[in-house]
């Protein structure tokens, strides 16, 4: 989804949560200043014409992995990377706003996993801490107006951003595992994010 299509949804999200567009733009500028190389061509190559599996970090992920097509291009939403690692799987890309980042992310990135790092108004300290430590491929994203080398393919939370990115970059099919949009054991903010994940994924034809 290009930004002109995404922008109306973004403003709805800002209003729903009371988030600051100015803070998002500040974070995007910070991330732009920390990007040393844009790995978007590599990410686009992974997606184009491929079968992509996006793994969310819901508790159901471990059960869902019994159906994982290991020949697919595997994307992890943030801490889902830890679950995949326990099963000996290194994802092709991790989509993260860094709130679930650990040193495992550094090791995966060094081994070739693309870190798709997202900037928003609440994660400036995490951007400053983690970005200089990544030695492998990185793609930078924002939920607001894109900048040179800071992209916006649509989507809001880590999981749905991964789906939107795969779709925009030409994946042939996208399978979703580890998404539980009806999880009752979440706080109100997370519940709102699940509401928006369902609403946004429906734009791409996913009934979750």
Residue ranges and their predicted role:
Residues 34-37, 44-46, 72-73, 79-171:
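Acidic/Gly/His-enriched mid-domain segments of enzyme catalytic cores or analogous surface patches
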Residues 51-58, 73-75:
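Short, hydrophobic/glycine-enriched beta-strand segments
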Residues 90-91, 169-187:
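Glycine-rich phosphate/pyrophosphate-binding loops
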Residues 1-52, 62-64, 179, 184-208:
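N-terminal donor/sugar-recognition subdomains of glycan-related enzymes
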Residues 59-61, 81-82, 158, 181:
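Short, flexible micro-motifs
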């Amino acid at each position: 989804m290009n930004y002109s299509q995404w922008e109306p949804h973004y403003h709805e999200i800002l209003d729903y949560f009371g988030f600051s567009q100015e803070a998002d733009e500040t974070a995007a500028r910070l991330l732009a200043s920390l990007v040393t190389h844009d790995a978007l061509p590599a990410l686009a190559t992974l997606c184009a014409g491929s079968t992509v599996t996006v793994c969310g970090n819901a508790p159901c992920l471990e059960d869902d992995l019994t159906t994982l097509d290991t020949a697919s291009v595997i994307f992890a939403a943030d801490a889902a990377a830890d679950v995949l690692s326990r099963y000996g799987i290194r994802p092709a890309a991790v989509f993260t706003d860094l709130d679930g980042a650990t040193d495992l992310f550094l090791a995966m990135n060094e081994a070739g996993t693309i870190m798709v790092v997202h900037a928003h108004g609440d994660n400036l300290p995490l951007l400053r801490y983690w970005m200089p430590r990544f030695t492998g491929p990185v793609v930078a994203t924002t939920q607001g107006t894109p900048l040179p080398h800071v992209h916006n393919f649509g989507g809001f939370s880590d999981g749905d951003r991964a789906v939107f990115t795969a779709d925009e970059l030409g994946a042939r099919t996208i399978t979703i595992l580890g998404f539980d949009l009806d999880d009752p054991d979440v706080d109100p903010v997370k519940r709102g994010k699940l509401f928006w994940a369902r609403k946004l994924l429906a734009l791409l034809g996913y009934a979750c």
